[in-house]
Every structure is written in C-alpha cells, then in structure tokens.
Amino acid sequence: MNPVFRLLCVLCVLCGSCFALDRAAFTFVHYDLEVRVDPAGHALAARGAIRLRNDSAAPQKDLTLQISSSLGWRMIELNGKPLPFVAEPYTTDVDHTGALTEAAITLPAPVPPRGVIELEVGYGGTVTQDATRLTRAGVPAATAARTDWDQIGEPVTAVRGVGYVAWYPVSLPAASLADTSLGEALADWKNSQRQSTMRANICWVGETQQLSVIANGRLEGVNRRVLGATDEATTQAGCSLYSFGPIGWTAPTFAIAEYTALSRPAITVYHLAGEQAAAQEYALAAEKVLPFESDWFGAPRSKVEVVQLPAAGDAPFESGPMLLTPFQTTDRKALEVGMIRQLAHASISSPRPWIEEGLAHFAQALEREQLDGRRAAITYMQQYLPALIAAEASAARVSGPRPPGLVSSGDEIMYRVKAMYVWWMLRDMVGDAALERALKSYRPAQDNDTGYMPQLIAQAAGRDLEWFFDDWLYRDRGLPEFRVDSAYPRATLRGAYVVAVTIEDLGAAGAEVPIFVTTSGGEMRKRVIVKGKQKATERIEVPGAPSEVTVNDGSVPAISNPGATLKIAPPAQR
C-alpha cells in the first residue's frame, strides 16, 4: 500500500474516532479521592477511584477525563493495570484557566449501556489565581480577579468545583462565555450528576498546626500529625474527611486557612485573626432573622456556615447553606437579607434548582418586605428584572423549540430570578398561610416528579392553578406584557363610581396581576387573571371620580409597556 495513502487512512480513522467521541456518555457516579494541598507551594496532588456508568444508548469503548489545565495526569488504571491515554489541552471556559487537561482513553473492551467501571486515577499540579477565561471574554482584569478568586495559597486556600476549577475529574463538551454554551454545558453536567456522590479526604501540609479545612460536605473525621522537624521548622499535616452528595447542583468546594470558629446553634462563622467582631455581626444577623425564616420554611435542618475570604472585593459565593465571602458588615439590613438566604438553604433542600435557589431568593424578598415594606421588596426583585428580560428575549430569538420550563431549567437567571418571582406571585395568589403549609409539607426524598411541589401548593390553596403552572413552570412562555386596553367609569346612585377596566396581555404567559384605580381620595386595588394573548375585564367600585388606572405594581415580572397606565378623563369631559 502506498505510504501516503496508508497515512491518510490512519488519519481518517483517528478523526472518525474524535468525531464519534461522546463526552457526555458516562456519568461519574462516585468519587473516592485523597487530595493533598500544599498552600506554600500552591500545589495539589490527588489520587483515588472514580466509578463511571455508561448512560448512553450504545456501548462505549472510548472516554475522556478532564482536569484543570494547571494540573496533569499521573496515572489512569483499570483493574490494577495502566490504561494508555493521550493528554492534551482542551480549550473551554468550564475552568478558570480557560482550558482543561483532557485524557483520551481507549478501554480494553466496550462498556455496555448501564455498565459500570471503576478507574484508579492520579493527578497533580498547581492551582493559582487565574482569570484567563474572563479576560479572554473582555472582562477587565481587576473585575475578573475578584470573580475568579480560586487559588491554593497563603493565608487562605479557597477552591470551588466544576464551573470554576476542575480539581476533580469531569467530562464536558467545550463551552464558551461568549454565548450560552457554558451555561448549557454546566446545566447538562449538573443534571446528569444530580445523584452522584463524592468522598474526599482533603489534606494540607504546612509549618503551622492551626490550619482548618472547611468544605460544603458532611465532615466525617479529622486527623492531624507531625511529618517531620528540623531546628528551623516543624512540618505539620492534617486531613479532613468529607462526604458530598448529591454533587450535581452543589459543586464540592473547600477552604483551608487558620480559621477560628464562632459557633451558634444555627450558624458557624469561620473567621481570620482579628475579625471576631465582624464574625459576631454575621451571627447576630442570622439569629435576628431566624424566627421569621422558620415561620416560613421550618426550622433549619443544618447549620449555616460562613467562611471568610481575605480580599475585600472578592465576589461572595454560596453553595447550599455555605457562604464564602469577604466580611461586609456596614449595612445591617443587607447582612440580614443575606443571612435569611443561607438559612432558607439550611431549612429546605431540593434536587430542583427552581425550588432550592428560587426559595432562597424569595426569602430575601420577604426579608426586604419585613424590614421596609412591600414596595422595598418589589424594588429588590426589580433590580434583577433586566437580566431576566434579556434572557427571555435571547431564548425567543433562538430558532427551534423554546428552552425547557422552569421545573427543569439549568439557566441560573431562570432558576434564581424567574423562580423568585414565581414564588412571590404564588404567595400573592394563595396567601401566606397556604404557601407556608405547602413549603413545610415538602419532602425532598418524595420529589420524584416535576408536579410534586405544584400539587402541594394547589392542595394547600384549595384552588386550580394548573394554568399558572403550565405558563410559568412546565413551559417557558416568556414574560407577560400588560397594557390597560380601556377604562370606563359609571356613576352610581350612591355617588360612587364603578370602573370597567379591561387589561390586555400581549405576551404569551398569563398571570394574576394587580390593577389600581386612582381617585382624589386614594387608590383602590383589585387582582385579575389575564391569560396570555387575551384580555380580561374587571369592575372596580371607587368612592370618588377615577383619574387613572395602572396595571401591575412590579410584583409580576413583565416587559414594560407605556400602556400600563391609562389616564381617565373627568366625567364632565366625557
């Protein structure tokens, strides 16, 4: 055979294998890792076992394992035998470095659908602060550094999981911050790993014995020992064994530093030296909002953990009831709003982001109302509305079917902001007491169907809400766009007026929306259900001559329309 032709054949086979590679075929069912961290050297070394299951419909002989591009593969074995692999850089914004180190592996035999294999792996390298993916996307360097602050170092090591730093093996398709692919890739990964678990023995090496490991898992044990000593220094080591699960929507995250713990019944604050007063402010804020939070969501099932980050400008990060944040205590109200969010996470956990995250944000709006009234709560929610409108507009421009409904959405804007509004609308529709009953009857272990929570709400409210769930949960119909179509006042024999108000929803999503009729003596309010692309008429009696009708007070997320307010001419001028 002609050598050139032979080479072309080989290349074709290799390219065919590359194109056929399914990076999403395997689910990482369980990790059992020992992770050693050297803060002084910014170093990480890990070894352990990974259990993978073929969740595709076809047998799989090839797979990929990916770690941060600042780490390298040392070994990959199956049944005690080394597997040949090729490790190459893989450009993607899944990791803070803007790339992964991907090992392409060919297995000795195909793994059938639902088949399980267990690999022994070893890898290591360094984790330094790196915001390449953000600066590459045009984010200013200073802003990028405050967002992607993850690093192993002194005085604080803080490392988040997939989506920030791939410090444990993953397998995802390439994704970019320049479009929606990063959010979609992470959402698919989180959904596929929603039942996966991890056990990680996280160890540090250093010259002080005061280092602590804090992680967003369940602590199973702590072990410390002296590794060696010289006239100049003593080398210490400590290990903390954590179990994480499920890890799909809660990426394993850890911090290592000389932390001091300020412990209260509902919260533990881990602070650095000299920060006890600020730590107490966090504890006091949590204790102040706890009774109100418990009335709504029930008593916390776990403790809130606040872990101090050293740099004042770093962006806070939450993972369930754990919050990594620089201490910010000058605004007491903001602190209380932040703490009720963490307490809500501690009270209600759910495998569904629209419940877990949506309720936490809803709790913040409730606290804003508790502090300064309904208008303040609506203003709080409206600061996030432009992002939601932009996300819905972007989804509408995409050809093909609309994105999944809120019950299964992996878009952060949807399961945080839109879900917050959904909970607020449900509260306005069914009342506090009914919604509280539904929330307190929720059991995550029984949530095996997307209709589970909606059924609890409908049962507690005693009314048919299927139309609302269909528009806002099961399907993504976008946002309403309300306008006052007409308003006709009619004088009554008692000297009052009845105003026939017709509201039109130009959007596809319906809602129960408040309408307001303004008179010289004040304002009358009534609620009306307006279905998408339809009109609804409501008659409102007011004590004096009406001057204006307004639809929506901002409690329903809607596209703004200049026709949302309509002036009513005085009766004498009609």
Residue ranges and their predicted role:
Residues C18-A45, R74, E466-W467, W472:
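N-terminal, polar/Ser/Thr-rich
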Residues R301, E412-G495:
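Amphipathic alpha-helical substructures
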